[in-house]
């Protein structure tokens, strides 16, 4: 194994170094990323999560990409916090189809005191099923963070979204510093961090590099790094944003893998718009986590049967979690193959 694959994790990346990674020949970049990936992970295993929106719409934040913002008319109806029992039913369903982590998202600036007891019950209930737990609830204070940790929350998601320099062009209702403070509270409470960003909002190459530098130069790398491709929603200020070049998106995944070689890099929002070939390249570039199921908060996500068939064709299996994930995964593949016999369920990659 070369020195480059065994080096100590770095937290001092510079813009010049990261820019140089982005602009090198595509095949060289992917080779470097795949080499590092294999040094730290089983290259044919992907972590599988399911995401549930536990409170949808009317968020007071003004994130220009988000259909849940109350500042924009996107046709999304406001919903109350889901009942704990409903959340637990969805978690059980997620486990039955092979997910090992259950993520719960609420459209809040920050959780209120009246909602916290219900949120904590959700964490305890999902944890009792043998699933890893993750939540994204907005900004947290120290007391809330410690309460979530005590309840057994494994991961807290709080994305940085983009570089500090470009951030003010996308969001004005929450500062970059507040996001970093929440991440610090999460780390101090002993939970794992899930934090990443979005491509396709009009950011520059240096902004993409800057986002990854912020994440990689944290005192500890996030355990999970979701890389999202903008899902353009009518009514949001970014509904007419330019499409992200597929190769540029793959480059982002590869550079994330190189900077944070021991983190799970998640192929997150926007996967519905990716054909099978692009997803396969994403896995080769070092992506080793996906959201699995029908919806990603409020936007479409590739159907579970399509995911299982693609995994089968690529020789990929989900990372083992509690509950015999391999057996569940194999059963899902067999069921998907049966359903594929119906033309209505057949997935034609050429037209995707």
Curated annotation (Swiss-Prot):
Signal peptide: none
Residue positions binding [2Fe-2S] cluster: 103, 134, 194, 266
Annotated ranges, domain Radical SAM core: 44-262
Keywords: 2Fe-2S, 4Fe-4S, Biotin biosynthesis, Iron, Iron-sulfur, Metal-binding, S-adenosyl-L-methionine, Transferase
Biological-process GO terms, alphabetical: biotin biosynthetic process
Pathway: Cofactor biosynthesis; biotin biosynthesis; biotin from 7,8-diaminononanoate: step 2/2
Enzyme class: transferase
Domain of life of the native organism: Bacteria
Pfam family, one: BATS
Co-factor binding comment: Binds 1 [4Fe-4S] cluster. The cluster is coordinated with 3 cysteines and an exchangeable S-adenosyl-L-methionine. Binds 1 [2Fe-2S] cluster. The cluster is coordinated with 3 cysteines and 1 arginine.
UniProt EC number: 2.8.1.6
Residues the entry annotates as binding [4Fe-4S] cluster: 59, 63, 66
Cofactor(s) essential for the protein: [4Fe-4S] cluster; [2Fe-2S] cluster
Record InterPro entries: Aldolase_TIM (IPR013785), BATS_dom (IPR010722), Biotin_synth/BioAB (IPR002684), Biotin_synthase (IPR024177), Elp3/MiaA/NifB-like_rSAM (IPR006638), rSAM (IPR007197)
GO molecular function: 2 iron, 2 sulfur cluster binding; 4 iron, 4 sulfur cluster binding; biotin synthase activity; iron ion binding
UniProt catalytic activity: (4R,5S)-dethiobiotin + (sulfur carrier)-SH + 2 reduced [2Fe-2S]-[ferredoxin] + 2 S-adenosyl-L-methionine = (sulfur carrier)-H + biotin + 2 5'-deoxyadenosine + 2 L-methionine + 2 oxidized [2Fe-2S]-[ferredoxin]
Quaternary structure, from the entry: Homodimer.
Function (record text): Catalyzes the conversion of dethiobiotin (DTB) to biotin by the insertion of a sulfur atom into dethiobiotin via a radical-based mechanism.
Similarity field: Belongs to the radical SAM superfamily. Biotin synthase family.
Record-given protein name: Biotin synthase
UniProt source species: Pseudomonas syringae pv. tomato (strain ATCC BAA-871 / DC3000)
The gene coding this protein: bioB
């Amino acid at each position: 194994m070369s020195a480059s694959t065994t080096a100590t994790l770095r937290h001092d990346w510079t813009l010049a170094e990261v820019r140089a990674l982005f602009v090198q020949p595509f095949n060289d970049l992917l080779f470097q990323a795949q080499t590092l990936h294999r040094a730290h992970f089983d290259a044919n295993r992907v972590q599988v999560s399911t995401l549930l929106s536990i409170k949808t719409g009317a968020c007071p934040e003004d994130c220009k990409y988000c259909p849940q913002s109350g500042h924009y008319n996107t046709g999304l109806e406001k919903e109350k916090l889901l009942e704990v029992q409903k959340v637990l039913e969805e978690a059980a369903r997620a486990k039955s189809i092979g997910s090992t982590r259950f993520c719960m998202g609420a459209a809040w600036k920050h959780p209120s005191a009246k909602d916290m007891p219900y949120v904590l019950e959700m964490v305890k209930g999902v944890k009792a099923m043998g699933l890893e737990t993750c939540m994204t609830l907005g900004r947290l204070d120290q007391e809330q963070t410690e309460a979530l940790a005590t309840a057994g929350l494994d991961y807290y998601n709080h994305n940085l979204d983009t570089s500090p320099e470009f951030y003010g062009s996308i969001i004005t209702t929450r500062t970059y510093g507040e996001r970093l403070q929440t991440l610090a509270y999460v780390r101090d409470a002993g939970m794992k961090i899930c934090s990443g960003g979005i491509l396709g909002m009009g950011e520059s190459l240096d902004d993409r590099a800057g986002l990854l530098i912020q994440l990689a130069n944290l005192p500890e790398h996030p355990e999970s790094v979701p890389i999202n491709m903008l899902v353009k929603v009518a009514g949001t200020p970014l509904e007419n944003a330019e499409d992200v070049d597929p190769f540029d998106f793959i480059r982002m995944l590869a550079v994330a893998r190189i900077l944070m070689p021991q983190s799970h890099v998640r192929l997150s929002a926007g996967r519905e718009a990716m054909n099978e070939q692009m997803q396969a390249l994403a896995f080769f570039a070092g992506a080793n986590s996906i959201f699995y199921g029908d919806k990603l908060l409020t936007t479409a996500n590739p159907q579970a049967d399509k995911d299982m068939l693609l995994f089968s064709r690529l020789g990929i299996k989900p990372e083992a979690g509690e509950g015999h994930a391999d057996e569940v995964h194999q059963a899902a593949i067999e069921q998907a193959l049966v359903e594929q016999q119906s033309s209505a369920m057949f997935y034609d990659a050429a037209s995707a």
